[in-house]
Amino acid sequence: MFEPVATARQRAVACCTFTTEQEDVVQWLVWALPALVIGLAIGAGIGILIYKNSVQSQIRQIEAEARLQLEATRSEQKDLILRATDEALRLRTEAEAQIREARAALAKQEERLQRKEENLDRKIEGLERRERQLQQRERQMEQLHQEAEHLRQQQRAELERISALSQEEARAIILKRVEDETRDEAARRIREIEKTMHEEADKLARKVISMAIQRCASDYVAEVTVSTVALPSEELKGRIIGREGRNIRAFEQLTGVDIIVDDTPEAVTLSCHDPVRREVARLALIKLLKDGRIHPTRIEEVVHKTQQEVDQVMREEGERVAYEANVQGLHPDLIKLLGRLKYRTSYGQNVLQHSLECALLAAHIAAEIGANINVAKTAALLHDIGKAVDHEVQGPHALIGAEIARRLGKSPAIVHAIAAHHNDEEPQTVEAWLVQAVDAISGGRPGARRETLDLYIKRLEALETVATSFSGVQRAFAVQAGREVRVMVQPDAIDDLGSIHLARDVAKKIEESLQYPGQIKVTVIRETRAVDYAR
């Protein structure tokens, strides 16, 4: 395979001639080259062997990883198959359950429909049976009607034969008899019903009103507007009049009040139809007398300041009364008009305190009977608001007050209750009747109001005159300060049932022709006396 080393050396020597150093190098190369070739061959073999071992190791590692991955894939595949199997089983179970529920619901629905159908069939059968019964009853009624008509014809002929009366004459007699019997029966029934109704109503009314009055418990003395101012001395009358009457003219012009200086010792009288202006004049005159400086400029200053003070007092009084009555949301103008009622009186009763008492009573009674409390107490508080301006506007104070309340935003129910509290409008609501009732209770209780002697006597005479204006009345007496009228009737002219009608007619005429506080009781007395003598 290789040539001998000596032969190669000889061939090299033959080819060229070298120096000694070159010969040494060549000789070294000759010896080193084979060794190098051998080393390279050995290294290449070792490298190939190492590379082969490395490749085989990697192949074994890759095969191991592939086997592990294959096993993991197979395990995951098994898990997926198991989960899919479980899910399919669950879905199948749920589907079967839903199918069973749907079948059960369908069966129940079919059962209900079956029952409804059976009930409907029974109802149809019942209706058909009832229809047959009605038809049979109609035939029976028709037969009875024919029999009755036949009997009526027979009776009519018999009556005409017996009484020798015509049909019209017999009908008139029968109708009159039936009318008399019906009237008497109706009067008896009315008396029984009224007796029962009055007993129950009086019992309930006493209970409700007593509870309301006890809870209200208003305690005050009726105020009277003072129009007389006391003077410390008679000399002040001349100072009030002033030089050539300039002081009194300035005072009357600024206040609109007439000052009456007469012979009354140490007093002057203030005269004016407006109680507010009269109060302003009274307070201003008292201040001028205390101050001592009385001249037109000072009078103008004091009157202006007093007007502001009275306006403030009216607002405060209106707010106080609204607060005590627990009525909220009133317009400022309504508050001021309420305050003006402080200076108004009705038969000696202060109108502002009367309105407050009515509001408290209305609230308590409305709570007892289930009426609208807010409407009742608000309408009761404002029911006399028209009296604050009724001298400035023409018309009944109830309608004036209702118009003011409507214009200032009160509800139609409140406006109607105010307008109807003196029957200027027909009461249509429970609250309207309630305001009438509390107005009568507050004004009609003993001591609340008073009348002059002349008015009192005239009212009693008017009551007796109304009662004696009816036929059959013998005498009439007004008793209990005009709160009851006792009517004595002629027993031959009016019977017991006629007494009921007479009492109602007298009460109705009193309501239509007279004005009075509270209510008036009408008692009709029919007395029959049988007298004989034993000899």
UniProtKB/Swiss-Prot annotation:
What parts of the sequence cross the membrane? 30-50
- Tell me, which GO biological process terms does this entry list? mRNA catabolic process
Query: Residues in domain KH?
Result: 225-285
Instruction: Point out the signal peptide segment.
Output: none
Q: Which SUPFAM superfamilies match?
A: Eukaryotic type KH-domain (KH-domain type I) (SSF54791), HD-domain/PDEase-like (SSF109604)
Q: Where is the HD domain?
A: 351-444
User: Its GO CC terms?
Assistant: plasma membrane
Show the InterPro entries listed in the entry.
HD/PDEase_dom, HD_domain, HDIG_dom, KH_dom, KH_dom_type_1, KH_dom_type_1_sf, Ribonuclease_Y, RNase_Y_N
Q: Which Gene3D superfamilies match?
A: Hypothetical protein af1432, K Homology domain, type 1
- Give the record's membrane topology: Single-pass membrane protein
* Top EC class for this record: hydrolase
Q: Which UniProt keywords apply?
A: Cell membrane, Endonuclease, Hydrolase, Membrane, Nuclease, RNA-binding, Transmembrane, Transmembrane helix
Task: List its EC numbers.
Answer: 3.1.-.-
Coarse class of the protein's main subcellular location: membrane
Q: Where in the cell is it found?
A: Cell membrane
Q: What does this protein do?
A: Endoribonuclease that initiates mRNA decay.
NCBIfam families attached to this UniProt entry: HDIG (TIGR00277), RNase_Y (TIGR03319)
Stated family: Belongs to the RNase Y family.
Protein name per Swiss-Prot or TrEMBL: Ribonuclease Y
